[in-house]
Design a protein with these regions (language model features):
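Exposed boundary/loop context
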Residues: 42, 57, 93, 184-185
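Conserved catalytic core of nucleotide-sugar-dependent glycosyltransferases
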Residues: 1-52, 60
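Positively charged N-terminal leader segments that act as targeting/secretion signals
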Residues: 185-193
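Intrinsic-disorder/low-complexity peptide segments enriched for small residues
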Residues: 14, 163-166, 186
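A conserved catalytic-core signature of glycosyltransferases
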Residues: 47-49, 53-55, 60, 66, ...
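C-terminal catalytic/acceptor-binding lobe
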Residues: 68-181
């Protein structure tokens, strides 16, 4: 993972310039890392997703984008929507394991190294938990992997496999299902898919 104490927007701009990504987008893997929210790779539960492809009816069936999320940047709305959608029986989570979602430093609410960042995250967590009426938990569901894995992404897949196997072993030793939420999914309201 990224050592945030040694990272800045200036360093990021230098890394991007050196990576040569305009001629090969996959070169971004050479300067990337897993995000803090999904730091264990693709075989661990995700907190959120930066790309959701769903029908309008499906979004409506979970109440849409809840406008009570009134904190800067939308607060934890992304986590809320992902949790609600992933918990539905008709929802299938696909992961493009050879692709990435690259988030740059830009002064955003939760990614900026500011003194009050931790306090903001606590307020967002508290608001999310109150709307869910329970502590937030990443949905533990089986991901379906799609797509090719370019050579530049192989180390990420290797890390994901190793981390996923460690998780699987830990759950087996505890007699638990690593994808326990899969069997507890709830039907969508109003049809949806």
């Amino acid at each position: 993972l990224l050592d945030e104490s040694n990272y800045s927007e200036k360093r990021e701009q230098t890394d991007l310039a050196d990576a040569g990504w305009p001629s090969n987008g996959y070169a971004l893997f050479s300067i990337s890392c897993y995000s803090g929210g999904n730091r264990h790779g693709v075989f661990h539960p995700f907190m959120e997703s930066n790309c959701l492809v769903v029908r309008k009816e499906t979004i409506f069936s979970i109440g849409g984008a809840d406008e009570r999320f009134d904190m800067p940047g939308g607060g934890a709305l992304n986590l809320y929507i992902y949790r609600k959608l992933a918990s539905r029986s008709e929802t299938v989570v696909f992961v493009l394991a050879g692709e990435g979602s690259f988030h740059q430093q830009h002064g955003g609410v939760t990614t900026s190294p500011v003194e009050a960042r931790e306090a903001k995250l606590i307020r967002q967590r508290d608001q999310l938990n109150s709307f869910l009426e329970a502590p937030f938990k990443s949905p533990c569901i089986d991901p379906i992997l799609l797509g090719k894995i370019p050579g530049s992404a192989m180390n990420y897949l290797k890390f994901s496999c190793e981390s996923g196997l460690n998780r699987l072993q830990r759950f087996q030793e505890q007699g638990r299902d690593p994808y326990e939420d899969e069997k507890n999914k709830t039907p969508l309201k109003n049809g949806g898919f």
